[in-house]
Amino acid sequence: YLAAKHQIKEIQERENLSFWENKLLEHPDQYPYLAKIASANTKLFSYTGEIRYLKSAELSLIALNKKTINAGHLRALARNYISQHKFQESLTLLIKAEENGENLIATQKMLFDVHLELGNDTKAEKYLKVLEQSNGFDYLIRASKWSDERGNLDRAISYLQRALAIAEASKNDELLLWSYTNLADFYGHNNQIKKSYEFYLKSLELDPNNAYAKKGIAWIVYSYENNPEESMRILSVIQKNHQSPDYKLLQAELAEYMDDEKQKKKYLQTYLSAVENEMYGEMYNQYNAKLFLEEYSNEDTALAIIKREIANRPTAASYDLLAWATLKNGAVRDALTIAEKHVVGKTYEPEALYHLAEIYKANDMPEKAKRLKDELVESSYELGPLMAVKIKQI
């Protein structure tokens, strides 16, 4: 699959984009063509990772929504904003679409997604209950996400397995691909590494150029097989056809693991140069905040980013970063106060639990730190070898 060079879907979509752009030039009054152009750009973003396609899709959808009061077009722009981490803007559009009432269930699915991303758990749960009546694929994948957010990974996997059965019965490649990659992720989080690998391979059988699945395999090769050189090779091959700044962060981690400080600095600088592109907006806030905190000890810059992220997205994950930055600043009691109010019992992500353990340790609460340490040892694969060393030191 690494040798897969023919980007057939990408080539076809570029031709499709060119066709509709030319049609619009010939007939500027035919604004429905904007939807076709936006769809082609969105697919090209998915295939290439190039942010310009996502931003081009946004412009077409904004123009389209000025011409219509169609709920489907509102949802399309809301979906684009979700990809850009513009969750507040997405919510505003979805509320309009809900008032419109057209294909209401499609809007309600997205309202669940956005409320969950914004940390509005009560509202998210309300929409999940509305969707429950269908018990279909779209409900099951959301019930899975909800269970995972609540720390119940076994139930999350069970919901996804049921969703996969529906996808297999429908023979819908898009649903199958979504099921395979997400099950691969969850099996990995559950330390079922062989199953995780098998499902990434199933994804590649359907789509040999799927960068997400290849990145998942690169992580297995690094974190489970302890082969950073091969993992680095996989990442280098992926980036020939798919561009995303976060590949550089993983390569920097691999370089650190291989004791190559010079190469690590180079990858981090390449990442920072990439995310300076204004088109990325708020998409990499959490990555950037952690980088400035942990690699550059630049608490002021990190704190400014974290405060922006909390304003955009007041989730437990955002407040976890605030607590972590506060600890790094030496205000150990304040860090504990923030964590107890906004993080404890609200997220079960291993990285947040690691931060919490360090906060407990700094506040002379060894029993609580030890309980989390025991839990974190189970998450060593998901967190990676470098973090596994830090966990042992708690």
Residues of each region from the PLM?
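Generic helix N-cap/helix-start motif at coil->alpha-helix transitions
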Residues: 31, 67-74, 100-108, 134-142, ...
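TPR/TPR-like (Sel1-like) alpha-helical repeat modules
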Residues: 132-136, 165, 239-245, 253-259, ...
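TPR-repeat structural position
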Residues: 13, 47, 54, 87, ...
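Structural motif corresponding to the intra-repeat A-B loop/turn of tetratricopeptide repeats
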Residues: 44, 48-51, 84, 118, ...
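Residue-level recognition of tetratricopeptide repeat
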Residues: 39, 79, 113, 145-146, ...
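N-terminal leader/linker segments that initiate helical-solenoid repeat arrays
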Residues: 1-74, 92, 125, 370-374, ...
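Canonical positions in the second alpha-helix
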Residues: 23, 63-64, 96-97, 128-131, ...
